[in-house]
From Swiss-Prot:
This is ATP synthase subunit alpha 2. It comes from Burkholderia pseudomallei (strain 1106a). F-type ATPases have 2 components, CF(1) - the catalytic core - and CF(0) - the membrane proton channel. CF(1) has five subunits: alpha(3), beta(3), gamma(1), delta(1), epsilon(1). CF(0) has three main subunits: a(1), b(2) and c(9-12). The alpha and beta chains form an alternating ring which encloses part of the gamma chain. CF(1) is attached to CF(0) by a central stalk formed by the gamma and epsilon chains, while a peripheral stalk is formed by the delta and b chains. Its main location: membrane. The keyword Cell inner membrane applies.
Length: 666
C-alpha cells in the first residue's frame, strides 16, 4: 500500500508549481513586441538638392532614419519647431511635395564583421563590387561614443608604414591619429596607401574611406591594394563624388564603426579617411541648405565638433578591454600651402601630429615630399622600436643642418672641409629618404641602412647609387641572415642584438662595392644605368625595378658564406669575395675613368681632335669608342671621374687598357 503525502506538503508543492507557471507567463508577455496601433505620418513640404523639409513629425529624434513613400530613406539632420530637415541617402527622383514620410524609430547603422573583409561597399553597407549582399545579422550605429579616459591605454606600439622617413622621424603608433596634409597632387593618398600596403605582413585590419573622390581614382587605389597589399584584410567604403551628399557625410562615421568592430575584439585596425577637406565641404553644403547660420569661411559653428567626435574614436584600449587599437590617418588638402586656414588648423589641433607634404619638394622629385621642418609626431619615440630610435637619433638634426647649409651654398662655394662633409652626408640622407611607391622597407632594413649611414659607409658612394642600395638591401640581408643562421636553429630577434645589427651594417659595405662595380660595368658596356628614383610606371608596373640579376649576384656572394656559420669564417669569405669584385671593378673603373678624363672640360681641344685626324689604328678606335660612350646615358660621369681619377702613371696604363679593349671590339 503506497503512502499518501500529508496535506501541508501537497499544498506547498501546488503553490510552487503555480508560482513557476506565473513567472513563465510573465516572461512570455515581456518578450512580446507591441507595435503602436497608430503611426504618425508626415508630409514633404519641399525638396531640393538632396534635402527634404518634412512637417508633421514633431517627435522625431536627431539622426533618426525616415522612410519616404517609394522606398527612399533619409536621416533627420536638423529639428525645427515646424519642419524637419531630412538628408536623403538615395536619389531624390521619387520624392516630391506632399510625399508621405514615416518614422522608423532606428538610427543609421552599418553592417560590421568579417564578411566585409575584401569588399567594396557604400556607407550603408550595400555592395559596390558586384558581390553578394552582406549579412546584416550584426550591425553597429554609425554614431558611437568615443572610449572614455579610463578605457584607454598609452600608445606604445609602432604602426610600421615601411616608409623610412616616416618610421624614422615621425613614428606612428597603434591608436594614434596622424594627419597627412598638403597641397593638391603632392602624394598624400600615395603615402596613406603605402601604409595600407605595408600591413600585408602584419595583423592590422585596414579600412579605406573615399569621400567625394573620382571613381577612376578610387579604382586605382583599390587595384593598387589588390596588387601589392592584402585585400583580404581590407575594407573599402566608397562615397564617390556622384553619390548623394548624405552618403558622403556619413562615410567616415561608417568607416570608423566598421573598424571599431575589430578593435573591440582585441584586434588592431587602421582607418584612412580620404579626405576630410571634402567632408568639411559637404558638411558646409548641408548646413547652408538647411539654413544653419554660417561662420568662418561659411562653415557652420559645429564643424570642429563634428571632426573632433569622429577622430576621438581612434584609441588604444586598455588590457581589460582586450588591448585592441584603432589608428587613424586622416587626409586634408591645403590651398597654396596655407596651413593657417580654418579646416587645417582644426584638424592639426585635433590630431596627434601631422605629416606635411610640400609641393616644391614634390616638384624636385623627392618622394615622399615630406617637409621635415613642419611635420611632427606627438607620440614619436614612445612608440618607436628601440633599435630604430637609437639608429635615427641624429638623422633629423643632420638633415636640417644640411638643408640650411644647402641654402647658403647657392650664394657661393664652401671651403671648410667640415661643412663639405655635412653637405655630402645630407645629400646621401636625401637620396636615402627618397623612396618610390610600393617599395616598403622592413624595420630591420631601416635600422641597418641608418646604422650604415651613421658609420659613414654611404659617404663615399654617389647619391645616384643610394637607390639601388635601398632596393637590393632586403634580399642581401635575407641571404646574409640565412647564411649566418645554423640549420634547425630557433628564430633569432636580430633587432634585439646590437652586435648582430652592427655586423649586418658592416656587411653593407660589401654590397656597396658590388653596386659600384655593377654601375661601372654597365657604364663600360653601354647599358643604361639603374633608375635612381625607382618609381617606374608610377603606381603600377614598378615591381620589376629591382633587378633579378642583381638579386642573383647577391645571393651568389652570400652563398659562399653559408659554408661556415661562424662570424670569423663569414668575414673571411666576405673579404675574399669582395677582393675579387674589387679587382674586377678597379679594372673596369680605370677604363671608364680614362674615357671620362678624355672628355673633361680641362682637356685641351687639340688633344680630343688629334686622334680623329689619324687615318686608322688604335687612336681612331679609341675616339670612336669615346663618341659611342658619350652618346650613352651615364649615371654620374663627373662623380665617377672624381672617384676613380688615376695618377699620371695609372692614367697611361688605363689608356693602354682602354685602347686594347677598343681594338678588341673592332
Amino acid at each position: 500500500m503506497t503512502p499518501t503525502p500529508d496535506a501541508p506538503a501537497a499544498a506547498d508543492a501546488d503553490a510552487a508549481t503555480g508560482a513557476g507557471w506565473l513567472a513563465r507567463r510573465r516572461g512570455a508577455l515581456a518578450r512580446v513586441a507591441l507595435a503602436p496601433v497608430a503611426q504618425a505620418i508626415g508630409r514633404v513640404e519641399r525638396v531640393a538638392d538632396g534635402i527634404a523639409f518634412v512637417s508633421g513629425l514633431e517627435d522625431t529624434m536627431l539622426n533618426e532614419v525616415l522612410r519616404f513613400e517609394g522606398g527612399v530613406t533619409g536621416f533627420a539632420h536638423t529639428l525645427d519647431e515646424d519642419l524637419i530637415s531630412v538628408v536623403l541617402l538615395d536619389p531624390d527622383a521619387g520624392v516630391r511635395a506632399q510625399t508621405a514620410v514615416a518614422r522608423t524609430g532606428a538610427v543609421l547603422e552599418v553592417p560590421a564583421g568579417p564578411q566585409l573583409l575584401g569588399r567594396v561597399v557604400d556607407p550603408l553597407g550595400r555592395p559596390l563590387d558586384g558581390g553578394a549582399p552582406l549579412d546584416a545579422a550584426h550591425t553597429l550605429p554609425i554614431e558611437r561614443a568615443a572610449p572614455a579616459i579610463i578605457e584607454r591605454d598609452l600608445v606604445s606600439e609602432p604602426l610600421d608604414t615601411g616608409v623610412l622617413i616616416v618610421d624614422a622621424l615621425f613614428t606612428i603608433g597603434r591608436g594614434q591619429r596622424e594627419l597627412i596634409i598638403g597641397d593638391r597632387a603632392t602624394g598624400k593618398t600615395s603615402l596613406a596607401i603605402d601604409a595600407i600596403v605595408n600591413q600585408r605582413h602584419s595583423d592590422v585590419i585596414c579600412v579605406y574611406v573615399a569621400i567625394g573622390q573620382r571613381a577612376s581614382a578610387v579604382r586605382r587605389v583599390i587595384d593598387a591594394v589588390r596588387r601589392y597589399g592584402a585585400p583580404e584584410r581590407c575594407v573599402f567604403v566608397v562615397a564617390p563624388a556622384a553619390c548623394a551628399p548624405g552618403l558622403q557625410w556619413i562615410a567616415p562615421f561608417a568607416g570608423f564603426s566598421i573598424a571599431e568592430y575589430f578593435r573591440d575584439r582585441g584586434q588592431h585596425a587602421l582607418v584612412v579617411v580620404d579626405d576630410l577637406t571634402k567632408h568639411a565641404a559637404t558638411h558646409r553644403e548641408l548646413a547652408l541648405l538647411t539654413r544653419e547660420p554660417p561662420g568662418r569661411e561659411a562653415y557652420p559653428g559645429d564643424i570642429f565638433y563634428v571632426h573632433a567626435r569622429l577622430l576621438e574614436r581612434a584609441a588604444k584600449l586598455s588590457a581589460a578591454l582586450g588591448g585592441g587599437s584603432l589608428s587613424a590617418l586622416p587626409i586634408a588638402e591645403t590651398d597654396a600651402g596655407n596651413l593657417a586656414a580654418y579646416i587645417p588648423t582644426n584638424l592639426i589641433s585635433i590630431t596627434d601630429g601631422q605629416i606635411v607634404l610640400d609641393s616644391a619638394l614634390f616638384a624636385a622629385n623627392q618622394r615622399p615630399a615630406v617637409d621635415v621642418g613642419l611635420s611632427v609626431s606627438r607620440v614619436g619615440g614612445k612608440a618607436q622600436h628601440p633599435a630604430l630610435r637609437a639608429a635615427s637619433g641624429r638623422l633629423r638634426l643632420d638633415y636640417a643642418q644640411f638643408l640650411e647649409l644647402e641654402a647658403f651654398t647657392r650664394f657661393g662655394g664652401l671651403t671648410d672641409a667640415r661643412l663639405r662633409a655635412q653637405i655630402t652626408r645630407g645629400e646621401r640622407i636625401r637620396a636615402l629618404i627618397t623612396q618610390p611607391r610600393f617599395r616598403a622597407l622592413r624595420t630591420l632594413d631601416e635600422v641597418v641602412l641608418l646604422k650604415a649611414l651613421a658609420a659613414g659607409a654611404l659617404d663615399a658612394m654617389s647619391p645616384d647609387l643610394v637607390a639601388p642600395l635601398r632596393e637590393r638591401l632586403p634580399a642581401w640581408l635575407d641571404a646574409r641572415i640565412a647564411a649566418l643562421t645554423p640549420a634547425l636553429a630557433p628564430p633569432r630577434d636580430w633587432l634585439a642584438d646590437d652586435a648582430a645589427l652592427d655586423a649586418l651594417a658592416e656587411s653593407v659595405g660589401e654590397l656597396i662595392e658590388r653596386i659600384a662595380a655593377d654601375a661601372a660595368r654597365r657604364a663600360t658596356a653601354g647599358m643604361p644605368a639603374e633608375d635612381a628614383a625607382g618609381d617606374i610606371g608610377g603606381a603600377f608596373g614598378g615591381e620589376q625595378a629591382r633587378g633579378d640579376a642583381d638579386r642573383d649576384a647577391d645571393h651568389g656572394a652570400n652563398r659562399e658564406v653559408s659554408r661556415e656559420v661562424s662570424p670569423e669564417a663569414s668575414r673571411e669569405v666576405s673579404r675574399e669575395v669582395s677582393c675579387e669584385v674589387s679587382h674586377e671593378a678597379d679594372r673596369d673603373a680605370a677604363a671608364d675613368a680614362a674615357r671620362v678624363a678624355g672628355r673633361a672640360p680641362g682637356r685641351a681641344e687639340p688633344d680630343r681632335a688629334a686622334p680623329r685626324a689619324m687615318p686608322d689604328g688604335p687612336p681612331r678606335a679609341q675616339a670612336d669608342g669615346d663618341r659611342a660612350s658619350a652618346s650613352r646615358p651615364r649615371p654620374d660621369a663627373r662623380g665617377d671621374a672624381a672617384r676613380t681619377a688615376p695618377s699620371p702613371q695609372g692614367g697611361a696604363d688605363a689608356n693602354v687598357d682602354a685602347e686594347a679593349e677598343a681594338r678588341h671590339k673592332r
